[in-house]
């Protein structure tokens, strides 16, 4: 009798603990991520707001990266990753990692202020050289104006949603290559489009990220992906000549 009584007491004490553990495990097992939801605003309204914001932008910082490819910015110089700053309307600073046609890694950059073009010598640390204006690979680079044109000329919007975790609107569509090629110092493929994804801040309607999936220049592979991340909108920024 004493043994049975002891066993009964143990079982009686164990059951609540086991129940709590089971509930805890069950709750953790069924935790699901916050779903991407339908926005409470139309994609046209979002793009209109974003276009207005971009037109009023004075300064911005950006990062460029590539998957499955690169951008040839000058003969034999291929940009893979870059970070830069832009002051509207005519000052750009960009530092990039890249390769030469022989596979040699280089780190270089450009500073363009009005009509003056300086290139960071890839073989001499911190040495900038003045170039003739016609050697400026980013002569038409204006990320603010280019993104404004992208917003205006977005086509075939296939998907549109809101991610509450990142507080961003996600827009998926197509864009003619001639509207995005100038960001990379390229001439767009004639009468061709590429897939584009936009991530737009839901509070201020800034463009946070642009992904271009597919070729925009005549030397691009079919599976190339370019990504541009924008940040630090309208913060004080001064680009000076070296």
Per-segment meaning from a language model:
Residues 45-52, 81-88, 109-117, 195-202, ...:
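Extended lipid/amphipathic-ligand handling interfaces
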Residues 65-71, 99-103, 115, 122-125, ...:
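Hydrophobic lipid-interacting interfaces of membrane-associated proteins
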Residues 18-91, 158-161, 235-242:
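N-terminal leader/targeting segments and the immediate start of mature chains
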Residues 120-189:
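Flexible, processing/modification-adjacent segments and terminal tails
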Residues 167-242:
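Gly/Pro-enriched, hydrophobic low-complexity segments
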Residues 74-81, 103-108, 190-195, 222-226:
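Short, surface-exposed coil-to-beta transition loops
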Residues 1-21:
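Sec-dependent bacterial lipoprotein signal peptides
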Residues 81-144:
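An acidic-aromatic
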